[in-house]
Amino acid sequence: MDELKNIIRDVPDFPKKGIIFKDITTLLADAPSFQRMVDLIAHRYVGKKISKVVVVEARGFVIGAALAYKLGAGVVLVRKPGKLPSETYSKTYQLEYGSDTLEIHTDAIAKGERVIIADDILATGGTMAAVVDMVEALGGEIVECCFMAELEFLGGRKRLPEGKVYSLLTF
């Protein structure tokens, strides 16, 4: 996995001073690395009867859509308010300084459908915890929350269902 980790660029002082941002765009732009990353994650779910991959705006769309394609599953978008055209279920959640809201179509997941939730990076876990609540409210069965990478020192895993978190890479 080191070959994939080494492609991810560190950007110091972004988005603010003191933060070292893990820039995944370098991995996404490198076709062999992107393919390897998707293949490695998808392999974990082969034979698990995944119906949908729930993806989180915006970088989660890239990873989750490729993953859904490999698994023969549908894609369900989770977006910021006002971006989805039909009836939505919304969830407001707390951030370090304030709150945010996400929406999902109310008819996107049928009761009992087996889903994975995919995003690029697990940091504090706040966004993913909100998405877990949304999927459960719609009746979806969460197989796992999966990430390309996890920033372990931020402890986001603790906010998610125990035993249902997978990260390909850890920092």
UniProtKB/Swiss-Prot annotation:
EC number(s): the record gives: 2.4.2.7
* Chief site of localization: cytoplasm
Q: Which residue pairs form cystines in this protein? A: none
* One of the record's GO molecular function terms: adenine phosphoribosyltransferase activity
Which Gene Ontology BP terms does the record give?
Answer: adenine salvage; AMP salvage; purine ribonucleoside salvage
InterPro entries xref list: Ade_phspho_trans, PRibTrfase_dom, PRTase-like, UPRTase/APRTase
Q: Which organism is it from?
A: Geobacter sulfurreducens (strain ATCC 51573 / DSM 12127 / PCA)
Broad EC category: transferase
Q: Which UniProt keywords apply?
A: Cytoplasm, Glycosyltransferase, Purine salvage, Transferase
Q: Which gene encodes it?
A: apt
In which pathway does this enzyme or protein participate? Purine metabolism; AMP biosynthesis via salvage pathway; AMP from adenine: step 1/1
| Subunit structure comment from the entry | Homodimer.
Domain of life where this protein originates: Bacteria
Q: What is this protein called?
A: Adenine phosphoribosyltransferase
Please give the function described in this protein's UniProt entry: Catalyzes a salvage reaction resulting in the formation of AMP, that is energically less costly than de novo synthesis.
User: Keyword Glycoprotein: yes or no?
Assistant: no
- Keyword Transmembrane listed: no
List the NCBIfam families hit by this protein, alphabetically.
Answer: apt (TIGR01090), PRK02304.1-3 (NF002634), PRK02304.1-5 (NF002636)
What Pfam families is this protein classified in?
A: Pribosyltran
What is the catalytic activity of this protein? Answer: AMP + diphosphate = 5-phospho-alpha-D-ribose 1-diphosphate + adenine
GO CC annotation:
cytoplasm
Which Gene3D superfamilies does this UniProt record tie to the protein?
3.40.50.2020
Family assignment from sequence similarity = Belongs to the purine/pyrimidine phosphoribosyltransferase family.
Where would you find this protein in the cell?
Cytoplasm
